[in-house]
Amino acid sequence: MRTIALSIALLGSTAAMAANDIVMHRDPGCGCCEKWAAQVRQKFGRAVKIVDDANRAVIHKRLGMPASLASCHTAIIDGIAFEGHVPIADMKRVLAAKPKGVRGLAVAGMPLGSPGMEAPGYPADH
């Protein structure tokens, strides 16, 4: 089943980041985040700066993201926030379209088959 990426309204300003920077804040105890970052690096052809962040609730609050959409990492790409294992194709669509009012996408939890959460018997959701 295809994971649905949910639009989230973010209150914090991420526009100050350079267009080429990809910054991923992650739970330092999580192992899947680095796999997700590796896929992002490969598919975007850009470096990913990984920031270990044990108190992720602070960034979620700053971005105005509801706790119900929280996952193990938050990436900021071209001023748009991506929470959790958002499929890379969906990220590229949002970054290309930059729809008015959409400041980010989220996939809550850690769904099997999503980037970084591949598992035998579950289709890859890219």
Where are these regions (language model features)?
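Positively charged n-region of N-terminal signal peptides that target proteins for export
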Residues: 1-4
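N-terminal signal peptide c-region/cleavage motif recognized by signal peptidases
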Residues: 13-16
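Local sequence-structure signature of Cys/Sec-based thiol-disulfide redox active-site neighborhoods
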Residues: 18-43
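Short active-site oxyanion
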Residues: 21-22, 46-47, 78-81
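Soluble non-cytosolic domains of exported or imported proteins
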Residues: 27-34, 50-54, 82-85
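Extracytoplasmic/secreted envelope proteins and their assembly/folding machinery
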Residues: 33-37, 56, 60, 88, ...
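Conserved helix-turn-beta segment immediately C-terminal to the redox Cys motif
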Residues: 37-57
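Thiol/selenol-based redox catalytic cores and closely related redox-interacting motifs
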Residues: 61-126
